[in-house]
Amino acid sequence: MTKVVVCALYKFVSLPHFESIRAPLLAMMEQAEIKGTLLLASEGINGTVAGTQEAIEALLVWLNSQNGLDNIVHKLSFDDEMPFYRTKVKLKNEIVTMGVEGIDPLKVVGTYVKPQDWNALISDPDVILVDTRNDYEVQIGTFKNAVNPVTETFREFPEYVKQNLDPAKHKKVAMFCTGGIRCEKSTAYLKEQGFDEVYHLEGGILKYLEEVKAEESLWEGECFVFDNRVAVNHDLKKGQYDQCNACRMPITEAEKQSPAYVQGVSCPHCIDKISDEQRKRFVERERQVNLAKARNEAHIGSDVNQVIEARREKKEAQRRLAAEKNNAKKSQVL
């Protein structure tokens, strides 16, 4: 039975005294045993956290009681295991970093399109559909016919727009991201650049997967998420991907069979990109993680390693159990 509720939330709102919110918010989360990270800035709040249903409900009630933080946009998904191992509330300059001064979604933003209306919009041949996420996210799943800007960070998105999009040529632009927050800024940026008809998926991919039936969906693949689940499928359950602890790229079970894959050290995506010094450091980190595991201790920075290792052991145990049952059946037949 699924016990962990994962809550992705954000809200753009003027928070001039956001620093004062950090301590009570962190205390509330720790008391409720909520794990994950929330970001606070003068422009609002953003993050993903996880806990019991009661804990997440309590957090939303607490936030709703704070001036300006009521009616926060949030999406819920579920997991059998806690995807975070720490509780953090960080103070930032931006809750999602684009690095462009003066972009304010509270002043100007694109047109929100509900998940139920999204298919009709992106099926319009006059609409250019742009995935605002990073390349490694796009690689494991995106909408049919979406353009991949091939960015490594969201900071690179404005340059992509300057080089590839033209208000005179691209009359209708639709954009999407994981939960909606990056599109708040990307659509605001396009509006500032003179684009007229700019649309974005309200609630992001996660809301679309929640509300649109798989048989009607135009989504292809899985959706990358920034926690130890790595990706979720159309049912918002953990998908088939793990993550390379060296480069953080999502990897498949097939890629883990490659000679280039060394747990905690390298994978087919980064084997030719990491230096000898990095390789030595990763080998030592993996050694320390294994030593800590043998002593039943938590190694700093090993959250992802721990979850991946736990899931790996769980899969192996399931395989052994299935093999034993199969052998038992064969013995009975004989």
From Swiss-Prot:
Domain Rhodanese: 123-217
GO molecular function: oxidoreductase activity, acting on paired donors, with incorporation or reduction of molecular oxygen
InterPro entries for the chain: Rhodanese-like_dom (IPR001763), Rhodanese-like_dom_sf (IPR036873), TrhO (IPR020936), TRHO_N (IPR040503)
Top-rank taxon: Bacteria
UniProt-listed GO biological process terms: tRNA modification
Catalytic-site annotation from UniProt: C177
Enzyme Commission number: 1.14.-.-
CDD domains: RHOD_YceA
The keyword tRNA processing is annotated on this UniProt entry: yes
Keywords carried by this UniProt record: Oxidoreductase, tRNA processing
This protein's record includes keyword Signal: no
Pfam families: Rhodanese (PF00581), UPF0176_N (PF17773)
Catalytic activity: uridine(34) in tRNA + AH2 + O2 = 5-hydroxyuridine(34) in tRNA + A + H2O
UniProt feature coiled coil, ranges: none
NCBIfam families the record matches: PRK00142.1-4
UniProt family annotation: Belongs to the TrhO family.
Function: Catalyzes oxygen-dependent 5-hydroxyuridine (ho5U) modification at position 34 in tRNAs.
Protein name, UniProt field: tRNA uridine(34) hydroxylase
Species, as recorded: Shewanella baltica (strain OS195)
